[in-house]
């Protein structure tokens, strides 16, 4: 493989951002574990949900790079990494083609998912609509005349799609019913995913402000955005604790608290370090902290049933 080919391959990997996929998978795994807890586990539905969620995450990553590059938001002096389009290695036409291919793959996996999982016409149509909204949300975060990521609505979108829809959707497609208690672990997943976005926006606050990208961090300001970050992390722990207290009722259900010292340490670091450059290593650490919390929660669910 030539150096130029390696450069292009690396550029595409940077745009695809495979390291973000575990966070997309985590919410589906949580929803599936909850379905298993209630005796509704369907491995084929779970697999198709994981594939669809992963493809939606890739679509969001590609669209984010495309939108920011077209708008000129990602400049050489930004703290975060420059990706394929910003480097000039990937053209607009190539990225558009990649977006179209990814949307087609999402449609195929999504159709397979609802065909296998949905037993009524209402469910089939309802999840087709939710799937369409997910595609639109993934693209319009940075793409379009008024992308919602530029007006501070990215956080609520992450909470909805990476929390509520992913967890409760994957549960419903296997259980075909909803229970009110699901809102707690679903919110916890959403808050942890939102914390990852918040770190990204804290890192890029100066370049975003200069380029008119009014993320929630820009709107809140550096101090309040750091307080908000601590609330996201601690809020996720509170939600999981309430779920165990009122629904799971198991000592194993507290296993997620093993991640609490790590989340507290991360919150304290973010509160203390005011330099945006200091947020660069925190992005990967926040992803790992969120993933660890979710996986410990899932393990607690499994152990609570085996120990019963």
UniProtKB/Swiss-Prot annotation:
Gene3D superfamilies documented for this protein: UbiA prenyltransferase (1.10.357.140)
Q: Please list the residue ranges that the record places on the Periplasmic side of the membrane.
A: 42, 119-123, 170-176, 248-250, 308
User: What Enzyme Commission number(s) appear in the record?
Assistant: 2.5.1.74
Q: Which GO biological process annotations does it have?
A: menaquinone biosynthetic process; vitamin K biosynthetic process
Molecular-function GO terms, alphabetical: 1,4-dihydroxy-2-naphthoate polyprenyltransferase activity; magnesium ion binding; prenyltransferase activity
Q: Report the locations given in the UniProt record.
A: Cell inner membrane
Q: Which residues cross the membrane?
A: 21-41, 43-63, 98-118, 124-144, 149-169, 177-197, 228-247, 251-270, 287-307
Q: Which pathway is it part of?
A: Quinol/quinone metabolism; menaquinone biosynthesis; menaquinol from 1,4-dihydroxy-2-naphthoate: step 1/2
What keywords is this UniProt entry annotated with?
A: Cell inner membrane, Cell membrane, Membrane, Menaquinone biosynthesis, Transferase, Transmembrane, Transmembrane helix
Q: Which cysteines are joined by disulfide bonds?
A: none
Q: Membrane: is it a keyword of this entry?
A: yes
Q: Which GO terms describe its cellular component?
A: membrane; plasma membrane
Kindly give the membrane topology term recorded for this protein: Multi-pass membrane protein
Residues in compartment: Cytoplasmic: 1-20, 64-97, 145-148, 198-227, 271-286
Q: Which reaction does it catalyse?
A: an all-trans-polyprenyl diphosphate + 1,4-dihydroxy-2-naphthoate + H(+) = a 2-demethylmenaquinol + CO2 + diphosphate
Pfam short name (any one) = UbiA
Q: Kind of enzyme, top EC level?
A: transferase
Looking up InterPro entries in the UniProt record yields: MenA (IPR004657), UbiA_prenyltransferase (IPR000537), UbiA_sf (IPR044878), UBIAD1 (IPR026046)
CDD domains referenced in this protein's UniProt entry, alphabetically: PT_UbiA_UBIAD1 (cd13962)
What this chain does, per the record? Conversion of 1,4-dihydroxy-2-naphthoate (DHNA) to demethylmenaquinone (DMK). Attaches octaprenylpyrophosphate, a membrane-bound 40-carbon side chain to DHNA. The conversion of DHNA to DMK proceeds in three stages: the removal of the carboxyl group of DHNA as CO(2), the attachment of the isoprenoid side chain, and a quinol-to-quinone oxidation, which is thought to be spontaneous.
> What family name appears in the similarity comment?
Belongs to the MenA family. Type 1 subfamily.
Give the protein name, as stated in the record: 1,4-dihydroxy-2-naphthoate octaprenyltransferase
Q: Which organism is it from?
A: Escherichia coli (strain K12)
């Amino acid at each position: 493989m030539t150096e130029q080919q390696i450069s292009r391959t690396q550029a595409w990997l940077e745009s695809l951002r495979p390291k973000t996929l575990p966070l997309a998978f985590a919410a589906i795994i949580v929803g599936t574990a909850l379905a298993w807890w209630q005796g509704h586990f369907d491995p084929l539905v779970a697999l198709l949900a994981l594939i669809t969620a992963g493809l939606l995450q890739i679509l969001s990553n590609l669209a984010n790079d495309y939108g920011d590059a077209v708008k000129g938001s990602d400049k050489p002096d930004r703290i975060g990494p420059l990706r394929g389009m910003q480097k000039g290695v990937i053209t607009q036409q190539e990225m558009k083609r990649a977006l179209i291919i990814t949307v087609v793959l999402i449609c195929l996996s999504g159709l397979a998912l609802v065909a296998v999982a949905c037993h009524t016409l209402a469910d089939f149509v309802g999840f087709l609509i939710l799937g369409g909204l997910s595609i639109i949300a993934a693209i319009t975060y940075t793409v379009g005349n008024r992308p919602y990521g530029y007006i501070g609505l990215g956080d609520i979108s992450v909470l909805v799609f990476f929390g509520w829809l992913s967890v409760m959707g994957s549960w419903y497609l296997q259980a075909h019913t909803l229970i009110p208690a699901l809102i707690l672990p679903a919110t916890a997943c959403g808050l942890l995913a939102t914390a990852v976005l918040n770190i990204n926006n804290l890192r890029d606050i100066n370049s975003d402000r200069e380029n008119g990208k009014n993320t929630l961090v820009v709107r809140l300001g550096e101090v309040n955005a750091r307080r908000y970050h601590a609330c996201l992390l601690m809020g996720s722990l509170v939600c999981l604790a309430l779920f165990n207290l009122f629904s799971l009722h198991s000592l194993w259900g507290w296993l997620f608290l093993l991640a609490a010292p790590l989340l507290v340490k991360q919150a304290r670091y973010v509160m203390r370090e005011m330099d945006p450059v200091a947020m660069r290593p925190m992005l990967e650490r926040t992803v790992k902290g969120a993933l660890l919390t979710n996986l410990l929660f899932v393990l607690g669910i499994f152990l609570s049933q085996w120990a019963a």
